[in-house]
Amino acid sequence: VTAFGSNGIGKTTFAKILAGVEKPTDGEIIEKVDIAYKPQYIESDYEGTAQDYLFENAPSYGSNIFNSEVGRPLALDNLLDKKVKKLSGGELQRLALAVTLSQDADIYLFDEPTAFLDVEQRLIAARVIRKIIESRNAASLIVDHDIVFIDYISDRAMVFSGEPGLNGKASKPADLRTSMNQFLGDLDITFRRDKETKRPRVNKYDSYLDREQKEQGEYY
C-alpha cells in the first residue's frame, strides 16, 4: 500500500504513529505485529563504516539471501569501506533500505524511500522492496511522491488530503487507479502510458490528450 498527497498533510506523522515513534493524540495503536521502519530523515552521525553499521543494525547481513536479494541489487559493496558520515544522500538511502529489509517483520514502513536516488536506482529499489515483501508474505506501507515508483510498487493506495500544516485525513486503501484519479483530479494533472516503456508520463497541460482524458474523467 502506498500513501501520497500534498506535503505537510500528515503522511509522515501517520507512519511514525504506526511505527511507535510518536503517540496518537487520540486513541491508541494496539501492537500485535512486528514492524520494520525506515524514517524519512536518515541520521548520518554514526562514527564507523557502512559495513560496521550493517553488522550492528542489519540482522541478516552477511547471509547469502541478503547478499543476493538486497546487497547486490543496491550495490552495497561500493559503500562498505566508506564512513557513514561521508556518505551522500543516495548512499545513505540505500544503506537505510538495506537495514530495513534485513529485518524479519510483518509490516515494512518506508517513508520516502526514493529520496536522493536517481531514476534507475528508484526502479531497482522498487523491485527489491516488492520482491522481498512478496517472498516473505508480508505487508508494506510506503510514503512517497514519485509517480513511476508508486505505479510499479503499488497494489493499493491511500490519498491524504486537507490543509497542509493544519489538518489532514486519509482515504481508505483503494486500487491504485481509483486513488490516482482522485489525487491527480485534485491537482488537475493527467498522466498517460508511454507506449514503449509502459511507464506513466505527465501530459502537457491543455494538450489534446490532457483535455480528452479530463473529459473522460481518466487522470491516470
Residue ranges and their predicted role:
Residues 106-109:
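Walker B motif beta-strand of ABC-family P-loop ATPases
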